[in-house]
């Protein structure tokens, strides 16, 4: 299996690198050294537990993805400790120029491998789904898939796979039902609960989130330090949530500098440091719109954020409440966070091959199943600005709208889904 080869190669490189600085590492950072070894020792049993062959049955695939993602996270954690510390500077002090160069080269290889590992489980999920289509499976047991998905740790790759299953094999009613079921599971509410209980539980869960999430803010991204040739006229992206009361701008460059010391297991606390430089300004309440890069949809609202429309959606739609506004914020920041680990952002955009898709991430590490809708064209962004990943633009909090046409050809291969979209 390719993923085992990637894991093995990464561990070999990590072992070689750690041997070079082992003595200094152990002497200067004993606690980090202990944690580093603990991460590595946890990998072996997970490798033994995870079979080489991707399982064909839906009841095994979510366990499989969970184990692979745990392995990747442990190795990324271990390499981040050893690469990001000041140990390298201590080791390099007094050494020959060639030795320093070799050490830097090895560190570069480890960094590259981190990006590969981060996407392994997602690629495995995509491979599993494509295999289902290629085998001509006419249906999947969505009830069983729902049980196995909701009873296991929710990872980004498992959420993406589950979403694809729903859209390829489910009716419109099934899609709505199982999406709502996943959302209820996330918010810790029972289907039999009254609406008052559901709303009360939802409000409680929101109260546990980071304060910025529930403040009604809208977020923009700037990158004034980027190469003008890369950005050209796309130096600023403003994303305005229709219900927001303030507009916040932050510098994307701060996020990009943290990519080597953060992981996708959660929104690393270092990422929050990027918000030290936020600038907040009031939003005009009677006329709010999102100003996006060329090629993107624009979302307009003119009645205090009660309704909205886009050029690709002809009818007006009622906006949901503050809960969904927080979800939209989570989705945007999550994609910014994930983008920080991708060295080649063009490759990152190509990997986002199914629209609409479910983003599975928030501050509380409870994975949400909230639909995100994209425009008909991918964002035409270059360089660092691609990290903003703005196809999550603002409509993540809409529950009642029909999805726009997905871009993933493997999804459209499903006759049922094609009929749903085209009709």
From Swiss-Prot:
Induction: Expressed in the late phase of the viral replicative cycle. Keywords: Virion. One of its GO terms (cellular component) is virion component. It is found in: Virion. Its main location: virion. Belongs to the asfivirus E423R family. This is Uncharacterized protein E423R.
């Amino acid at each position: 299996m390719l993923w085992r080869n990637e894991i093995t190669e990464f561990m070999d490189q990590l072992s070689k690198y750690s041997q070079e600085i082992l003595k200094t590492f152990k002497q200067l950072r004993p606690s980090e050294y202990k944690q580093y070894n603990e991460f590595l020792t946890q990998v072996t049993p997970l490798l033994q537990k995870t079979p080489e062959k991707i399982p064909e049955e839906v009841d095994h695939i979510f366990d499989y993805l969970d184990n692979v993602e745990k392995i990747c996270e442990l190795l990324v954690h271990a390499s981040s400790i050893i690469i990001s510390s000041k140990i390298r500077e201590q080791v390099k002090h007094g050494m020959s120029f060639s030795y320093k160069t070799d050490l830097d080269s090895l560190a570069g290889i480890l960094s590259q491998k981190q990006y590969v590992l981060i996407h392994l489980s997602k690629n495995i999920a995509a491979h599993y789904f494509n295999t289902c289509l290629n085998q001509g499976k006419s249906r999947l047991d969505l009830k069983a898939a729902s049980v196995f998905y909701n009873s296991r740790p929710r990872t980004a790759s498992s959420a993406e796979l589950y979403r694809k299953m729903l859209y390829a094999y489910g009716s419109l009613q099934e899609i709505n039902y199982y999406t709502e079921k996943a959302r209820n599971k996330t918010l810790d509410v029972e289907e039999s609960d009254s609406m008052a209980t559901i709303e009360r539980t939802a409000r409680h869960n929101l109260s546990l989130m980071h304060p910025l999430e529930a403040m009604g803010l809208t977020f923009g991204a700037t990158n004034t330090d980027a190469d003008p040739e890369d950005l050209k006229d796309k130096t600023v992206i403003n994303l305005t949530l229709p219900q927001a009361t303030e507009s916040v701008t932050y510098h994307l460059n701060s996020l990009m500098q943290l990519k080597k010391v953060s992981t996708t297991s959660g929104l690393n606390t270092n990422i929050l440091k990027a918000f030290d430089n936020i600038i907040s300004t009031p939003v005009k309440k009677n006329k709010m719109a999102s100003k996006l890069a060329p090629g993107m949809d624009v979302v307009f609202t003119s009645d205090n954020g009660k309704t909205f429309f886009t050029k690709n959606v002809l009818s007006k739609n009622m906006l949901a409440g503050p809960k969904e506004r927080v979800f939209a914020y989570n989705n945007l920041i999550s994609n910014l966070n994930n983008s920080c680990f991708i060295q080649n952002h063009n490759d990152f955009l190509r990997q986002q091959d199914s629209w609409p898709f479910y983003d599975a991430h928030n501050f509380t590490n409870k994975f949400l199943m909230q639909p995100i809708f994209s425009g008909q064209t991918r964002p035409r962004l270059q360089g660092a600005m691609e990290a903003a990943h703005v196809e999550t633009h603002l409509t993540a909090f809409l529950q009642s709208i029909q999805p726009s046409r997905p871009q993933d050809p493997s999804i459209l291969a499903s006759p049922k889904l094609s009929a749903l979209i085209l009709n």
